[in-house]
């Protein structure tokens, strides 16, 4: 049906008869001469037709998004008529034959216009996908999947599918449940990850497994979350943390070659505690400096009781400083007010600061600081004339969170972030347990190997867990797993999953661990998030062919939707009114 893709035609094809197919991108009638920009997956080419052509009458019928097959001779455009924005901007095809394969209603969205309301784009996603940008995204997505498969296969990993219909197990989010027609009153769960099955594959001697896995989580959505998503999932036997990290680094190095980046190995490693204390995040963006500085000791003799009391409780409280170089000449009062309002959204009671001016240090905190305390702050933060030092004080968790967010906000405001940089980081030594209102739960998941399980303070127990971070975004992570039944039971007990409940929920795993499970560990990389970063897309929805909205609905198909009474009866379900 065609001899060339539209954007493949070049000056070497001048004089040749060309046959192309695609959609009418734009249509123009200039004094009786018809110009059509034809679009296919490769790009655009201009078709031209004057009244002397036998294709002229058909060309007059063409409108936007009509499906066309065109035949004609390639020629150079006239002087001054070239379009430097197009790959084919020096060429046009003089129409000899034109077939309208299909007509189109007037499109409700302009193809390729990102400023169109997103709900409308998602409702007509099949039209939105016609844009050249969308094609390039999904071309790269396909290439990266192939690179991942080949890279892991070369390292001896087997691609093995794990079940989609499975058993509900607590992994941090709500499960999507599927009622069983055969087993009345019982439900399957869609997997939040292949976690337990890939561990069982290691027990089964598969040694190295991977899959590009579909996962499902019924959770509140953000810009980088979807209820169904894809991850590059892998597990390996007889391995250390270093072995797993090495595989991930090799894999990411191969993947980023696809977009022309040669990333260096090994990646920097940072303990979780250091990441939180110095950057206020377990996924710090290291493309810029701006570390958080602990200055609690500078407030020990403060005349402000609130600050001095906080300074005397270093286990539970923090006073953090953020020195922003040269900010005094840039941040107006209105900007300082905006920054205060920003941190107050995340639990701050206000935003104290010191302005380092030619005639001394100014700001509301000065009167509460001793001469020694002020001097120590300036030394610790390295503050000089023209700088502003911001302070956060209070509960450790809250302060680290909002000061970490402030760090990012300031970097964005001052344009400190190199958008072309790739800064990879391993965050390691995560806490094994986190305290909640209902006791402790596993910070990663309860199948992670702890480092010091006998420690009486559960919050001090660390896990053999690791996250890989790119530019402040968690790409993925993993852990060394528990491979002995006794240890698994100990961990369950720490999070109040006692024997009866453990057997009910995880009996199959505990049973498997009795039969010589090898030491093993693995990782998962968020595939959608990876492609979002590689393409610099603003939303994860841009890199998924048919994504859900932030309300977990599909505007294209109107899913989820009601089902009829007969289907409900077959599933033994009665809906309450």
Curated annotation (Swiss-Prot):
Q: What name has this protein been given in UniProt?
A: Aspartate--tRNA(Asp/Asn) ligase
List the GO cellular component terms: cytoplasm
This enzyme catalyses: tRNA(Asx) + L-aspartate + ATP = L-aspartyl-tRNA(Asx) + AMP + diphosphate
| Lineage, uppermost ranks | Bacteria, Pseudomonadati, Campylobacterota, Epsilonproteobacteria, Campylobacterales
InterPro entries, alphabetically? Answer: Aa-tRNA-synt_II, aa-tRNA-synth_II, aa-tRNA-synth_II/BPL/LPL, Asp-tRNA-ligase_1, Asp-tRNA-ligase_1_N, Asp/Asn-tRNA-synth_IIb, AspRS_core, GAD-like_sf
Quote the subunit structure annotation: Homodimer.
Name the protein family: Belongs to the class-II aminoacyl-tRNA synthetase family. Type 1 subfamily.
Q: Where is this site: Important for tRNA non-discrimination?
A: 30, 80
Per the record, the major location class is: cytoplasm
Q: What class of enzyme is it?
A: ligase
| Provenance organism | Helicobacter pylori (strain Shi470)
Q: What is its EC number?
A: 6.1.1.23
**Location in or out of the cell:** Cytoplasm
Q: Gene for this protein?
A: aspS
Record region (Aspartate)? 195-198
């Amino acid at each position: 049906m065609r001899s060339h893709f539209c954007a493949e035609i070049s000056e070497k094809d001048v004089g040749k008869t060309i046959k192309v197919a695609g959609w009418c991108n734009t249509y123009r009638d200039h004094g009786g001469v018809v110009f059509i920009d034809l679009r296919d997956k490769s790009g655009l080419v201009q078709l031209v037709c004057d009244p002397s052509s036998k294709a002229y009458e058909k060309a007059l019928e063409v409108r936007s998004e009509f499906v066309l097959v065109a035949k004609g001779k390639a020629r150079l455009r006239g002087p001054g008529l070239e379009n430097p924005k197009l790959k084919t901007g020096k060429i046009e095809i003089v129409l000899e034959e034109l077939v309208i394969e299909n007509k189109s209603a007037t499109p409700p969205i302009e193809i390729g216009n990102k400023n169109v309301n997103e709900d409308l784009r998602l409702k007509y996603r099949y039209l939105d996908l016609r844009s050249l940008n969308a094609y390039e995204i999904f071309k790269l997505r396909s290439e990266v999947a192939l690179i991942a498969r080949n890279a892991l296969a070369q390292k001896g990993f087997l691609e093995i599918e794990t079940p989609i219909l499975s058993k509900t197990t607590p992994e941090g989010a709500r499960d999507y449940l599927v009622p069983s027609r055969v087993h009345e009153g019982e439900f399957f769960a869609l997997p939040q990850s292949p976690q337990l099955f890939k561990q069982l594959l290691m027990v089964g001697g598969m040694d190295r497994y991977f899959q590009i896995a579909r996962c499902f989580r019924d959770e509140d959505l953000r810009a980088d979350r979807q209820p169904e998503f894809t991850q590059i999932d892998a597990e390996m036997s007889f391995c250390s943390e270093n072995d797993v990290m090495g595989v991930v680094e090799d894999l990411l190095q191969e993947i980023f070659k696809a977009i022309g980046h040669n990333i260096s190995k090994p990646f920097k490693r940072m303990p979780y505690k250091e990441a939180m204390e110095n950057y206020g995040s377990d996924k710090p963006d290291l493309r810029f400096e701006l570390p958080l500085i602990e200055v609690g000791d500078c407030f020990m003799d403060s005349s402000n009781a609130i600050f001095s009391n906080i300074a005397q409780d270093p286990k539970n409280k923090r006073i953090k400083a953020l020195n922003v170089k040269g900010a005094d000449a840039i941040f107006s009062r209105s900007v300082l007010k905006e920054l205060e309002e920003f941190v107050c959204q995340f639990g701050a009671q206000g935003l104290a600061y010191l302005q380092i001016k030619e005639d001394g240090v100014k700001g509301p905190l000065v009167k509460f600081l001793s001469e020694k305390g002020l001097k120590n702050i300036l030394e610790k933060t390295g503050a000089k004339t023209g700088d502003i030092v911001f302070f956060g004080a209070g509960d450790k968790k809250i302060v680290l969170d909002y000061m970490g967010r402030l760090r990012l906000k300031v970097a964005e405001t001052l344009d400190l972030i190199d958008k072309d940089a790739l800064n990879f980081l391993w965050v390691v030594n995560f806490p094994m347990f986190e305290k909640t209102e209902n006791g402790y739960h596993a910070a990663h998941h309860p199948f992670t190997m702890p480092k010091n399980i006998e420690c009486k303070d559960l919050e001090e127990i660390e896990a053999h867990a690791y996250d890989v971070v790119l530019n402040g975004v968690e790409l993925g992570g993993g852990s060394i797993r528990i491979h002995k039944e006794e240890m698994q039971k100990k961990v369950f007990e720490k999070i109040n999953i006692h024997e009866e409940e453990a057997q009910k929920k995880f009996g199959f795993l505990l049973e498997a661990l009795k039969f010589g499970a090898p030491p093993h560990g693995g990782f998962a990389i968020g595939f959608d998030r990876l492609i979002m970063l590689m393409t610099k897309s603003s939303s994860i929805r841009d890199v998924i062919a048919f994504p859900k909205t932030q309300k977990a609905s599909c505007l294209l198909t109107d899913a989820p939707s009601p089902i009829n009474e007969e289907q409900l009866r077959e599933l033994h379900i009665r809906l309450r009114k």
